[in-house]
Amino acid sequence: MDTTIDDLATKQCKPCEGAMPPLSQEEITQLMRQLDGWNYLGKTIRKEFSFKNYYQTMAFVNAVAWISHREDHHPDITVGYNKCQVEYTTHAIGGLSENDFICAAKIDTLFQI
């Protein structure tokens, strides 16, 4: 059974230990199919979100911060007037983990609201 974005968005991040290997290329490919508009960049996934104004951009960034705090998994965020770029990687393992995809799915779900 394939994982859907809704399945990913309902999962919780698990603590990542350095001994855990990064996801395989096959696992990454399968999980990327569940995300809309995210780009795979080797050891990271990234998406740019656009908004009408600075207030909406910052409201979204604050919501992402709340999700990140709850999941204890934090992205790199670049903010502009009416856009923001979110990039995930799991630094502890030097690559991508399921946690990156869980958080990306949660953010995508938030953006649809």
UniProtKB/Swiss-Prot annotation:
GO terms for molecular function: 4-alpha-hydroxytetrahydrobiopterin dehydratase activity. Its EC number is 4.2.1.96. GO terms for biological process: tetrahydrobiopterin biosynthetic process. InterPro entries: PCD_sf, Pterin_deHydtase. It holds the Pfam family Pterin_4a. It catalyses: (4aS,6R)-4a-hydroxy-L-erythro-5,6,7,8-tetrahydrobiopterin = (6R)-L-erythro-6,7-dihydrobiopterin + H2O. Keywords: Lyase. The keyword Transport does not apply. NCBIfam families: PRK00823.1-2 (NF002017), PRK00823.1-4 (NF002019). Belongs to the pterin-4-alpha-carbinolamine dehydratase family. This is Putative pterin-4-alpha-carbinolamine dehydratase. It comes from Nitrosospira multiformis (strain ATCC 25196 / NCIMB 11849 / C 71). The lineage of its organism: Bacteria, Pseudomonadati, Pseudomonadota, Betaproteobacteria, Nitrosomonadales.
